[in-house]
A protein has these predicted regions:
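Short pre-functional
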Residues: 1-13, 29-32, 150-154
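Short, basic (Lys/Arg/His-rich) helix/loop patches that form interaction surfaces
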Residues: 43, 104-160
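A cytosolic small-molecule/anion-sensing beta-strand core signal
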Residues: 6, 19, 145
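Conserved tyrosine-mediated DNA breakage-rejoining catalytic core shared by Y-recombinases
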Residues: 17-104
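Acidic donor-binding helix in nucleotide-sugar-dependent glycosyltransferases
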Residues: 14, 161
Length: 162
């Protein structure tokens, strides 16, 4: 996930809340929905992460299939969508790319379902990796986002899309 933060320029929560349908391998894009300020945007899916991300999604699909066999398999979707498409919560595309290991009670619906992974776990992993790399400064998911921006600007890439 940390490599996706850097490679895709994602914020920590954007990565955690990424859904399967938001990854377009054909065009090499990631669709970020409801990012900072509630804005949607599109970012690049790095080529060097495609195989790894594809394997992650295949593992999530298998987990979803297992959840369905055990009588679960729902995922949280916005209320308006749930009303319009009652079966959408069970569709694979709506499931998280990085789900929690265990199912839990969703406080909004009162149903047991798989939530997205925990942001604190990703934050700790980034911090631990920075310490192992010998970084004495504080490193976070936002630091990785700033690094990719700096590297792109240094290579003459225009970041604003009109």
């Amino acid at each position: 996930m940390a490599r996706l933060l850097y490679g895709g320029g994602l914020r920590l929560l954007e990565c955690i809340r990424l859904r399967i349908q938001d990854v377009d391998f054909g065009q090499g894009l990631i669709f970020v929905r409801g990012g900072k300020g509630g804005r949607d945007r599109t970012t690049l899916l790095p080529r060097n992460l495609r195989d790894e991300l594809q394997a992650q999604i295949e593992a999530v699909k298998a987990l979803h299939h297992q959840d369905l066999e055990e009588g679960f398999g729902d995922v949280y979707i916005p209320e308006a969508l749930a009303r319009k498409y009652p079966k959408a919560a069970r569709e694979t595309g709506w499931h998280w790319v990085f789900p929690a290991r265990a199912r839990s009670l969703d406080p909004r619906s009162g149903r047991v379902m798989r939530q997205p992974g925990r942001a604190s776990g990703l934050h700790k992993a980034v911090t631990r990796a920075a310490a192992q790399a010998g970084r004495d400064k504080r490193v976070s998911g936002q630091t990785l986002r700033h690094c990719v921006t700096t590297h792109l600007l240094a290579h003459g890439v225009h970041l604003r899309v009109r």
